[in-house]
Amino acid sequence: MKTVLVFGTFDGLHNGHRFFLREARSRGDYLVVVVAPDRAVQELKSREPRAPHEVRRAAILSENLADDAVIGDEEQDAWKVLNRYKPALICIGHDQDALAKALADFIKKERLPITLTRLPKI
């Protein structure tokens, strides 16, 4: 089974998110969405999220956009979810440059057998 992982805030689920998640899901057998915790949204976007992380997680699951959705680590760049799910592939959004670099550095440092791929914009 090929597990695919994606990361995001998903604060106000919209058609761009839906496209991204469907595209990621098509790349494997099992899609796990890692929803940024509220504190991370505050740090990344310099504002409070519109909806708490549990509501954002539930929205993804209620639309059947993923096989599982989890709340990300409170500690930035801990990547505990990688050990938990052992993805073969991580899909990166068109606007996730900082995430792509941080993940690439971690994967290289830890010598993990994970491929990163950037998905197109809608």
Where would I find each of the regions flagged by the language model?
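Nucleotidyltransferase catalytic core that binds NTPs
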Residues: 1-122
